Amino acid sequence: MSTQTLERPTPTAASMADNVGEVTEILKLLSAPARLLAVCHLVDGEKSVGALAELTGSKPTTLSQHLALLRAHGLVSTRRDGTTIYYTLASDEIAGLIAYLHKAWCKA
């Protein structure tokens, strides 16, 4: 039986240069502890602002401001149910990044 490895194409200098600004912006957004902690909790699925505030120890109003910034930059998306707003990670790429960070540094 043969095993196949999935090979990712090697990025070119030009493609890396094209994307470095976007990646830098994402890392800046995640450098705030409250925002990083909130998105870490979203890896497990959607959560309301209230649930995230309880999990992170943040005030709901402060956390709402952080989440609004993440939403404006496309890192999270929302769903409204009555007066409750639920947040989820907006892409598989963001979920993968956060899952990697969690696996590498958040060992129990």
Model regions and ranges:
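Intrinsic low-complexity/disordered segments
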Residues: M1, T62-L63
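N-terminal helix-turn-helix DNA-binding core of bacterial DNA-binding proteins
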Residues: A17-T61, D81, I85-D92
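A composition/secondary-structure signal for short, hydrophobic, low-basic-content segments
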Residues: T61-T62, I98
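Residues within the DNA-recognition helix of helix-turn-helix
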Residues: H66
